């Protein structure tokens, strides 16, 4: 075969591939061809769920870094495995009898993997959240992060318990504690208190030069926090770091350093290194507040969980917290792009699968479900639950969304997604567009600093979800933008607005 013939065959194959992908409309092409995107790579597909056909596409079979659109798969697998009505049950047991109000043994909190254990619940049956992932430096979640633990302490007190001869122990054996989430580096654990961070809120003084003050949430004696922070002039960029005392082996002495401008408080955070130990301490605090005299577990030895489990019977249960349905937890994950919660789900699903087969993990559960649905996973790569290690093709994502839409829980999944220009991570995207309020989709972002050019590079921006056209056509879509490097302010915002604009244009023109 001659080189010219090989070239001709390659050109013909490429032409056939392009012909098989209906090109996007001119208005969308104009967005893609903007000068700032000249080095970037686009991929997308808009797919009619009822006609089961592609409306238009670009690079639909190529793999793209998807960012947090990965959470669509993670959450969908959990919907399919746990069910939308699944409730987490976190229980407190005693290991011995009660004599004169004193437990002759330990009090053991059995972690259930509830991602929202300490999140305040609205009376309407939803969890409180802000439109930004709390773990990424967003403001503290509304309400007292220890309110659920206080309710459990009140239940124990109502049983007449006034103390324990043993210790307060957290059984975190549901799955392995200690792996750090890829995006935030927060520790994954079956016990999640305040998203496994302590909020460090820095309040400036009234005038420049005055010291700033620090408060923490949850309020606990677990930490000693020193402040070396100064108030700067209004408009000065905030610079706050939370440092651990290197001489403190327990990581319980912190110092806040830096500056904050006159005005509103600045939020920082400290990632809890061992959530189960932190949980033992704060649970002991709230039990003592309820009049139950206890101490947290002492020493570094891992408890004998098998021995403790013999006490996990109804007659020894002293308190229980039942979560809202999983569909409410999914709203927090998808609306705010909650990394820790999403990263925990494969561990949780793996722990349930391991009951049936010891060699199962969460990704085995996902693969079996996806392939059982007839989806070709050649267009998908997933190494974590949140999106720090994944690749997807636009065509895989739209077929996945097609499958999800047909499930009994598909409406709950759809309603948990951010809404364009309205809420969640899409609250500020295309707020004045005709499609605002009409597109439900998950965002995704992965960026890093480019020290060579002193700028941010957006490795990935994604948007995938659904809308219904004005004529009633149900559309699933996936849009990806990779390798966006341009000297523009806030490039992730520029990319996010562009993807939102593409979705909005599609809503306008698809009849």
Question: For each predicted feature, which ranges?
Answer:
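Bacterial N-terminal signal peptides that target proteins for export
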Residues: 1-6
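Cleavable N-terminal signal peptides
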Residues: 7-8, 18
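N-terminal signal peptide c-region/cleavage motif recognized by signal peptidases
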Residues: 14-15
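Conserved serine DD-peptidase/penicillin-binding transpeptidase domain
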Residues: 21-34, 80-377, 471, 494-497, ...
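Residue-level preference for non-acidic, small/hydrophobic
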Residues: 28, 52, 71-78, 168, ...
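A short, well-structured edge-of-sheet supersecondary motif
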Residues: 33-58, 299
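Small-residue-rich helix-loop
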Residues: 55-57, 147, 343-511
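Short active-site loop at a secondary-structure junction
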Residues: 57-77
């Amino acid at each position: 075969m001659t080189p010219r013939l090989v070239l001709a065959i390659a050109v013909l194959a490429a032409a056939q591939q392009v012909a098989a992908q209906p090109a996007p409309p001119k208005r969308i092409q104009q967005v893609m061809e903007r000068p700032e995107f000249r080095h970037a790579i686009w991929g997308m597909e808009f797919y009619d769920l009822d006609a089961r056909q592609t409306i238009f596409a670009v690079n639909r079979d190529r793999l793209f870094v998807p960012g947090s659109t990965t959470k669509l798969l993670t959450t969908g697998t959990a919907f399919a495995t746990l069910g939308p009505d699944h409730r987490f049950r976190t229980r407190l047991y005693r290991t011995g009898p009660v004599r004169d109000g004193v437990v002759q043994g330990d009090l053991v909190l059995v972690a259930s993997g509830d991602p929202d254990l300490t999140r305040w619940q609205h009376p309407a049956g939803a969890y409180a959240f802000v439109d930004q992932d709390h773990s990424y430096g967003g403001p503290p979640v509304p309400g007292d992060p220890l309110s659920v633990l206080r309710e459990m302490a009140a239940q124990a007190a109502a049983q007449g318990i006034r103390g324990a001869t043993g210790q307060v122990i957290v059984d975190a054996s549901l799955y392995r504690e200690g792996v750090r989430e890829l995006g935030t580096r927060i520790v994954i654990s079956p016990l999640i208190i305040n998203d496994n961070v302590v909020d460090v809120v820095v309040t400036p003084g009234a005038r420049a030069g005055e010291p700033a003050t620090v408060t923490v949430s949850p309020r606990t004696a677990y930490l000693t926090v020193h402040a070396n922070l100064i108030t700067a002039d209004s408009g000065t960029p905030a610079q706050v770091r939370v440092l651990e005392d290197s001489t403190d082996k327990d990581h319980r002495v912190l110092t806040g350093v830096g500056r904050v401008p006159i005005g509103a408080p600045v939020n920082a955070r400290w990632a809890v290194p061992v959530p189960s130990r932190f949980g033992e301490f704060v649970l002991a605090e709230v039990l003592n507040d309820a009049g139950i005299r206890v101490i947290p577990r002492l020493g570094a030895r891992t408890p004998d969980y098998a021995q403790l489990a013999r006490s996990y019977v109804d007659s020894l249960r002293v308190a229980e917290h039942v979560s809202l349905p999983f569909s409410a937890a999914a709203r927090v994950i998808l609306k705010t792009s909650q990394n820790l919660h999403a990263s925990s789900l494969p561990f949780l699903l793996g722990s349930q699968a391991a009951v049936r087969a010891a060699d199962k993990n969460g990704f085995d559960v996902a693969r079996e479900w996806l392939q059982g649905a007839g989806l070709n996973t050649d267009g998908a790569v997933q190494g974590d639950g949140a999106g720090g290690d994944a690749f997807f093709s636009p065509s895989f994502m739209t077929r996945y969304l097609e499958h999800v839409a047909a499930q009994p829980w598909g409406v709950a999944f759809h309603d948990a997604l951010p809404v364009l220009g309205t809420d969640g991570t899409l609250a500020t995207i295309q707020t004045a567009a005709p499609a605002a309020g009409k597109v439900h989709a998950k965002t995704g972002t992965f960026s890093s600093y480019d020290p060579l050019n002193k700028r941010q590079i957006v490795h990935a921006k994604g948007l995938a979800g659904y809308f219904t056209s004005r004529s009633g056509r149900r559309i699933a879509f996936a849009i990806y933008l990779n390798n966006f490097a341009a000297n523009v302010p806030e490039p992730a915002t520029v990319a996010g607005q562009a993807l939102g604009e593409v979705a909005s244009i599609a809503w306008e023109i698809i009849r």
